[in-house]
A protein has these predicted regions:
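Early extracytoplasmic/lumenal segment of secretory-pathway proteins
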Residues: 1-48
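Short, hydrophobic alpha-helical packing/hinge segments within bilobed ligand-binding/sensory domains
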Residues: 24-26, 44, 188-191, 207, ...
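Hydrophobic residues within well-ordered alpha-helices
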Residues: 29, 141, 191-193, 235
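Paired acidic/hydrophobic, glycine-rich loop segments that form the ligand-binding mouth/hinge
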Residues: 35-39, 181, 198-203, 218-219
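Extracytoplasmic ligand-binding site segments that recognize negatively charged/polar headgroups
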Residues: 38-189
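A ligand-binding cleft/hinge motif common to bilobed small-molecule-binding domains
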Residues: 43-48, 201-216
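Periplasmic-binding protein-like
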Residues: 66, 168-174, 213-237, 282-285
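Mature extracytoplasmic/periplasmic domains
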Residues: 226-227, 231-290
Length: 290
């Protein structure tokens, strides 16, 4: 609980609205009535371009100094030398797998992209999933970067027309293998427990949740590498409570708060000191979460 302490210390009242997807968050911000949003990287630039969020003054946020240097001035929230929010949490898009099927961790993303028999001798068709979001295009591009070097992919996030076509061809060829395109973490966790799904891209949140339930689940980052995500706390253009909003952004960058959030979600804190200053996260929490 990182809200009650904030309310007691500042006198501000926090009202929370949750959303299942980035598209839903963008829609909610378009309707208005919110002061802040924790926007993922596939929503933050849409909010900036759509003028739904405003630049912030980082000098009004004392804990700004705590932020991981790798996340400062990142292109998903800094545009035209203006800063549109504070880093919240980040993490990798891992390959989650069933340890009863894979006695050793799969070394390649090919287990979800290419038709094949898995180590238990059964086909992967109908037993793998893919993420239902734009980042999965980059996931596929990263796989092709390693497996089809003749395409000349340098960055999975910046593709030529030829490279983009090759990625779409891969995704279309993958479609018959897919059990479900997931976007809801609880549904994906249920699919791994009850629907025979044995491999998929996922977040550490699902992995940790299933492991805590004693499910035969683990995760890995295959040899081709992995993409990632980063959430940013952003201030609505028409925020009615900017003072409390600034206090919340500052509060959210405290090492203990960052560590507690990382422990709850299975993510990585935007503040490195959080790796050592949260009892909930623990000494090995950052390593466990990726």
């Amino acid at each position: 609980d990182w809200v009650t302490g904030f309310e007691k210390e500042t006198g501000c009242k926090v009202n929370v609205k949750t959303a299942a997807t980035s598209d839903e968050m963008v829609s909610l911000m378009a309707k208005g009535g919110y002061d802040l949003v924790t926007a993922s990287g596939d929503a933050s630039l849409r909010l900036i371009v759509g003028k739904r969020v405003q630049p912030i003054n980082t000098s009004l946020i004392p804990n700004w100094k705590n932020i991981d240097p790798r996340l400062k001035d990142a292109p998903w929230y800094v545009v035209g030398q203006q800063t549109y929010g504070t880093p919240y949490q980040w993490g990798p898009n891992v390959l989650m797998y069933n340890t009863n099927v894979f006695k050793t961790a799969p070394t390649s993303w090919n287990v979800v992209f290419d038709a094949q028999n898995l180590p238990d001798g059964k086909p992967n068709k109908g037993r793998v999933q893919a993420y239902d979001g734009p980042i999965y295009i980059a996931d596929a591009a990263l796989y092709l970067k390693a497996t089809k070097p003749e395409l000349g992919i340098q960055s999975p996030y910046e593709l030529t027309e030829t490279q983009y076509k090759a990625v779409l061809d891969l995704l279309r060829a993958q479609q018959p293998l897919i059990h479900r395109y997931w976007h809801d973490t609880t549904v994906q966790m249920s699919d791994f427990k009850n629907e025979g799904v044995v491999a998929s891209s996922a977040w550490p949140y699902q992995v940790n949740g299933l492991v805590n339930e004693k499910q035969p689940i683990a995760s890995t980052i295959p040899k081709e590498g992995a993409t990632g995500w980063a959430d940013t706390t952003m201030l609505h253009t028409d925020a009615k409570h900017p003072n409390c909003a600034y206090k919340w952004m500052d509060w959210s960058l405290q090492p203990k708060v960052q560590g507690d959030v990382a422990s709850w979600f299975g993510s990585l804190p935007a503040v490195p000191a959080a790796c050592k200053e949260s009892e909930l996260l623990g000494a090995e929490g950052c390593k466990t979460n990726g």
